[in-house]
UniProtKB/Swiss-Prot annotation:
Organism: Methylobacterium radiotolerans (strain ATCC 27329 / DSM 1819 / JCM 2831 / NBRC 15690 / NCIMB 10815 / 0-1)
Name of the protein: Small ribosomal subunit protein bS20
Domain of life: Bacteria
Gene Ontology biological process terms, A to Z: translation
One protein family per Pfam: Ribosomal_S20p
Function: Binds directly to 16S ribosomal RNA.
Keyword Amino-acid biosynthesis (UniProt): no
Amino acid sequence: MANTASAKKMTRKIAKRTAINRSRRSRMRTFVRKVEEAIASGNQQDALAALRAAEPEMMRAAQHGIVHKNNASRKVSRLAARVKALAA
């Protein structure tokens, strides 16, 4: 339990920040799931549209420190490769 006023304030700030981070992470995962569902359905047009929507969302999460920049880039790259493979 926080004893000082500043510690209590930090507890409030951390709770607020945690909620924001949780929301951003969830939003990113939702976009990734939509891409994976489109890939599973085999429709390249839908998968490409979903990927184009997901990429900025993933990079935004990386910018805010939700995931590491390299992690987001790797996921985008792997999803793009899977979408490209649908055309073949």
